[in-house]
A protein has these predicted regions:
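Catalytic domains of carbohydrate-active enzymes that cleave complex glycans
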Residues: 450-733
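Acidic, contiguous N-terminal accessory segments
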Residues: 26-137
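Feature activates predominantly on carbohydrate-active enzymes
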Residues: 62-77, 81-83, 117-314, 344, ...
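Acidic helix-start/capping segments at beta-turn-to-alpha-helix junctions
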Residues: 92-110, 171-172, 177, 530-534, ...
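Bacterial N-terminal signal peptides
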Residues: 12-22
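Bacterial N-terminal signal peptides that target proteins for export
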Residues: 2-13
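Catalytic-core regions of glycoside hydrolase
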Residues: 90, 112, 209-211, 247, ...
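Surface-exposed patches in mature extracellular/periplasmic domains of secreted proteins
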Residues: 87-95, 168-173, 238, 523-527
Length: 733
């Protein structure tokens, strides 16, 4: 009896050790999987219910109708996801044999066509999908149907998301399609792999190894984007190197395009307007010159031979030193249309950025893009999209919506958002930007009466455009977790979800990401979701409250610098924007100042132009406000300003306590990383508070209000802080 017992204990010990090791491996998290964590569902009863509802994957699509690679990606995702979430293999079969079969296909499948209506198929459109619980001949099934292969892939991710979120699927009934056609990431990546305003390592694109070696991470990148419905990527910096258009580099671009194509992603390139001179041996880039026109046409032909589904060109022209058509006495429309003509035969588009301002123009910088582009409305060709930042300055923590939205009804406008945190603490500070983007998308321009939201302009529905686009400047790099801060991938996720459907609530998006990235533990979900949803406003409070803007340190844009007044351009100086003096604070953009308000529709201009009706959040953007002005709270503007700075600091401290309480509820690797980052964020929030309140106090001459902590150091201490090699800055190249 002793020997068998000993053997049995050895077996049990080995099994126990294996389980412990597996458990430890499962708990080790480096963030690489992002929100696509297909670990077994913790609720065993729910997991078993899902397993009964999803017993096999039925796929028998005619191969002629579909790109084989995308169909294979759909199958592989379902197999991988269901195996991981359910803890069992779910076979792929050609014909349903069990209850709970998952039926996957298109209208070409005669067995599936009767299960949906024409109305559903129209609603699904080109890229959407139908997910539905159905009964076929008395047998319960789950239907995943789409008009095209990419819709099947998007639908597969949507189904797996429902399981990750622990949603019931026994009454599943979902028809979903994107509201915006082109949903792009913009990478500000240089060919030397430096990422301008990047905080998560170097560029993903291994140009020196391409086209021979294609990093498997490109496919993981495509897969993550497909899970959100992002369908395009601009690979390189808007401050473009003309080498990207040489034949050698185009072959490298083609290799990346091949890796991303199965996931529905089209590749775009940022191009330099003067490329015909720099890599084309021409003496001019004048868009009216026939030789220049022929060069761009020939270059487009070359690109499309290599990349048949190439998306088009993104152009930054006549801005911040970049060349453009104005160098030759031409307009933005002249330059964009010349390039657009080269792309028309291939179905490509030109995306022309409206981020323009001129140091020789002494007009308010906030007005300059409107002044340049508004007169050109209706003069761009039909395959030109004007890409407009969310606000009129430059991705500040809070800006009013850009006045061009609603001002160019005959021109498609794309909304450009910044996912990377150039002005919100890089990848050090927690700043979830879903609420910021939702704020601008829901903003009512009143351009065509009430309800003329920025979202309806961007999706083309308000002005009846046949093309629509939204873009996000990526926060992605070679860091193992992709985005630097363990919670920053929530911004990538939020951008993708809002690009697909900007009517989604930010609380829903934050809840989804938290559950998929961490767990469905209610305490974990409540804590992290609350932190995410508070974070943008907290950063606004301790950096630039009440409509203050552009008061950060020079060049690297990290930390406070309201005192800076020595930049070579006036409109690069924080003092240009805050205009603090003995009387008050803020930029007067009313009729008595720069009159930038006149660029907005009358109802908006009227509301924002009156101190009594202007939102507190935009007060100092549009008004020079006396220090002793009484705010809605009853406090003076000075007291309100200082208390906002303090509140931002207090909020970060609350997060620290909340995060500490999660110890043991999430993996140690990510918990420890975030704990360290929150400590630094709290310290730097105090620096912002102390630097800004002391600096503005030199003008107000007023004491800090009760409730605001005294500064730790004198103002000179903060003015003397010099940071070097901040990631994403020119010095760090």
């Amino acid at each position: 009896m002793i020997a068998p017992l000993s053997h049995r204990w050895r077996v049990w010990f080995a099994l126990l050790l294996t389980l412990v090791l597996l458990g430890s491996a499962a708990r080790a998290e480096d963030g690489y999987r992002l929100w696509l964590r297909y670990d077994p569902i913790a609720d065993s009863a729910l997991r078993q219910a899902y397993a009964r509802s999803l017993t096999e994957i039925v796929m028998n699509e005619p191969p002629s109708r579909f790109g084989a690679a995308t169909l294979a990606a759909t199958r592989d995702e379902l197999v991988r996801g269901l195996h991981g979430l359910l803890g069992t293999d779910v076979p792929v079969v050609a014909k349903a044999t069990r209850d709970g079969a998952l039926l996957v296909g298109t209208p070409e499948n005669p067995d599936l066509l009767p299960l949906v209506s024409e109305r559903d198929l129209r609603a699904a459109s080109e890229e959407g999908y139908i997910l539905r619980h159905v009964v076929v001949d008395g047998h319960p099934r789950v239907l995943l149907m789409a008009n095209h292969n990419i819709g099947l892939l998007y639908g597969a991710f949507a189904l797996l998301r429902e399981l990750q979120l622990n949603h019931p699927i026994d009454h599943l009934d979902m028809v979903s399609a994107p509201r915006i056609q082109r949903r792009l990431l913009n990478h500000w990546d240089d060919l030397n792999r430096f990422v301008e305003r990047g905080y998560a390592g170097r560029s993903l694109w291994e140009w020196f190894q391409l086209p021979d070696y294609v990093d498997p991470r490109y496919r993981d990148y495509g897969r993550a984007n497909a899970s959100l419905g992002i369908n395009g990527t601009v690979l390189n910096n808007v401050n473009a190197d003309p080498l990207i258009l040489t034949s050698d580099y185009l072959r490298k671009v083609a290799a990346i395009a091949n890796a991303l194509r199965p996931y529905g992603m089209r590749v775009y390139l940022s191009v330099r307007f003067s490329a015909p001179v720099e890599v084309g041996d021409l003496t001019t880039a004048d868009p009216f010159d026939p030789a220049v026109q022929r060069w761009w046409s020939a270059k487009a032909d070359e690109i499309y031979r290599l990349i048949p589904d190439f998306g088009g060109f993104l152009v930054k022209a006549n801005s911040e030193g970049q060349p453009g058509p104005q160098n030759y006495g031409r307009t933005h429309a002249d330059g964009a249309n010349m390039m657009a003509d080269a792309l028309v035969p291939h179905g490509g588009v030109v995306i022309w950025r409206a981020f323009v301002y001129d140091d020789k123009n002494h007009e308010d910088r906030a007005k300059q893009a409107y002044d340049e582009f508004k007169p050109l409305d209706g003069k761009f060709h039909s395959n030109v999209i004007i890409q407009v930042k969310n606000g009129p300055i430059d991705f500040m923590p809070r800006e009013p919506f850009h006045p061009l939205f609603g001002a160019m009804p005959r021109t498609p406008l794309s909304l450009e958002l910044q996912i990377t945190q150039e002005y919100l603490g890089g990848s050090i500070h927690l700043a979830h930007l879903g609420p910021m983007w939702k704020e601008v998308l829901d903003s009512d321009t009143h351009a065509d009466g009430p309800g003329s939201t920025v979202g309806r302009i961007v999706d083309g529905s308000l002005e009846h455009h046949g093309i629509s686009m939204i873009a996000g400047v990526a926060n992605i790099g070679t860091d193992r977790n992709w985005c630097g801060h363990p919670l920053d991938a929530a911004n990538w996720y939020a951008f993708g979800r809002l690009a697909w459907d900007y009517t989604l609530g930010t609380d829903t998006i934050a809840d989804e990401w938290t559950r998929m990235t961490f767990s469905n533990d209610p305490r974990v979900v409540r804590t992290i979701t609350k932190m995410l949803l508070e974070s943008r406003e907290a950063v606004v409070n301790y950096e630039m409250p009440l409509g203050l803007h552009h008061i950060m340190a020079s060049d690297h844009h990290y930390g406070p610098g309201p005192w800076v007044n020595d930049m070579k351009r006036a409109d690069w100086n924080p003092t240009y924007y805050h205009r603090a003096d003995a009387e008050g604070l803020g930029f007067d953009r009313t009729a008595t100042g720069s009159n930038a308000l006149a660029q907005y529709a009358p109802p908006v201009a009227k509301a924002w132009g009156d101190l009594a009706t202007c939102p507190d959040t935009l007060l100092l953007w549009f008004h020079h406000v006396p220090w002793t002005y009484r705010m809605r709270s009853g406090r003076t503007m000075w007291d309100e300003l200082c208390l906002h700075y303090q509140h931002g600091v207090d909020t970060v401290r609350e997060w620290q306590k909340s995060w500490d309480a999660l110890h043991g509820s999430i993996d140690d690797e990510r918990w420890s990383h975030v704990k360290v980052l929150l400590a630094r964020q709290e310290r730097e929030a105090r620096q912002w508070r102390d630097a800004c309140t002391q600096y503005f106090q030199t003008f107000s001459k007023l004491p800090l209000p009760v409730g605001v902590e005294p500064p730790e150091h004198p103002l000179a201490y903060y003015e003397a802080i010099k940071l070097h090699y901040v990631p994403g800055s020119a010095e760090a190249k």
